[in-house]
C-alpha cells in the first residue's frame, strides 16, 4: 500500500514537471494541484516539498515563497542548507538569510515594505535583483520583490546595497554576476560600484584586524592615545576601534 502511495506521488510530480505552475498574480488554481493537495495538511509535509512550488495558490503559500533570498547562492548556498530550515538551532537564521528557500517570505520577514514600481514590472525583473547592473535600481524600486526591505518596515532610501565588505564585517560579494563583470573592477566608471557590490571579486576587502599580537597588552596601557593615528591603525586597528 505504501508503495502505491509513493508511485502516485511520483506520477503526480512528473505531471507537474510538464505542466504550468499556478499563477500567484492571478490567484489561479490548477485542478491537478487540488488533487495532489486534497488534504491541505500535505502543504506542510516535507514529502510534498518538491511539488509545493507549482501549487502555491492551492496551498495559500504565495506570500511564503514569492521573494528572493537576500544574497545569491554564490555567497550563501541556501539550496544546500535547505535541510536546516526547520532545525531548532538554525531556523531563525535560515528565516532571515534564506526566506525564499524555506518558504518564510511573510510580512514579518521579506515583505516588510512595498515596491515602488508596478508589481508586473518588479516580477518581470526579479531575476536581475542580484545583478551588478541593476542591483541598486531594483533595490530602490522593487525592495519587496528583491527582499531588501529594512527591518523597520519602511521603504529604503535611494542608496542601497552592500558596504564593500569593509570594517569588521565578513567580506562577500553581494551581486551574483561579479565574476562575469570582474574586468570592470579597475574601470574608472565602474570601480566604485564594483568595489561595493563585488569586494571579494575585486580584491577590495578591508577586513579589520590587529597586525600585532601584543595589542591586548598595549591597549590597556594607553597605546591608542599615546601614538599617532597612522601607527595605531597599522598596529592595533581593531583593538583601538579605528578601522577604516
From Swiss-Prot:
Span of the signal peptide: 1-19
S-S bridge residues: 113-149, 122-142, 129-146, 171-205, 178-198, 185-202, 208-243, 215-236, 224-240
Keyword field contains Zinc-finger: no
Source organism of this protein record: Caenorhabditis elegans
Glycosylation sites: 45, 77, 152, 158
InterPro entries: ShKT_dom
All residue ranges annotated as the ShKT domain in the record: 67-105, 113-149, 171-205, 208-243
Keywords tagged on the record: Disulfide bond, Glycoprotein, Repeat, Signal
Name of the protein this chain belongs to: Uncharacterized protein ZK643.6
PANTHER family hit by this protein: SHKT DOMAIN-CONTAINING PROTEIN
Keyword Lipid metabolism recorded: no
Amino acid at each position: 500500500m505504501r508503495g502505491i502511495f509513493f508511485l502516485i506521488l511520483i506520477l503526480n510530480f512528473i505531471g507537474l514537471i510538464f505542466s504550468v505552475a499556478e499563477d500567484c498574480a492571478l490567484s489561479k488554481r490548477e485542478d491537478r494541484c487540488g488533487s495532489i493537495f486534497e488534504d491541505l495538511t500535505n502543504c506542510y509535509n516535507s514529502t510534498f516539498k518538491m511539488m509545493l512550488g507549482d501549487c502555491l495558490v492551492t496551498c495559500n503559500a504565495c506570500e511564503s515563497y514569492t521573494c528572493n533570498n537576500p544574497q545569491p547562492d554564490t555567497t550563501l548556498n541556501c539550496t544546500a542548507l535547505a535541510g536546516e530550515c526547520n532545525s531548532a538551532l538554525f531556523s531563525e537564521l535560515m528565516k532571515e538569510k534564506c526566506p525564499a528557500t524555506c518558504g518564510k517570505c511573510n510580512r514579518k520577514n521579506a515583505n516588510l515594505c512595498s515596491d515602488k514600481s508596478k508589481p508586473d514590472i518588479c516580477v518581470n525583473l526579479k531575476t536581475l535583483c542580484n545583478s551588478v547592473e541593476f542591483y541598486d535600481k531594483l533595490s530602490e524600486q522593487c525592495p519587496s520583490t528583491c527582499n531588501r526591505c529594512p527591518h523597520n518596515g519602511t521603504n529604503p532610501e535611494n542608496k542601497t546595497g552592500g558596504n564593500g565588505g569593509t570594517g569588521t564585517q565578513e567580506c562577500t560579494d553581494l551581486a551574483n554576476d561579479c565574476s562575469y563583470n570582474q574586468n570592470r573592477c579597475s574601470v574608472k566608471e565602474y570601480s566604485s560600484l564594483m568595489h561595493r557590490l563585488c569586494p571579494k571579486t575585486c580584491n577590495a576587502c578591508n577586513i579589520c584586524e590587529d597586525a600585532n599580537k601584543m595589542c591586548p597588552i598595549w591597549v590597556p596601557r594607553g597605546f591608542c592615545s599615546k601614538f599617532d593615528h597612522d601607527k595605531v591603525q597599522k598596529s592595533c586597528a581593531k583593538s583601538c576601534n579605528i578601522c577604516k
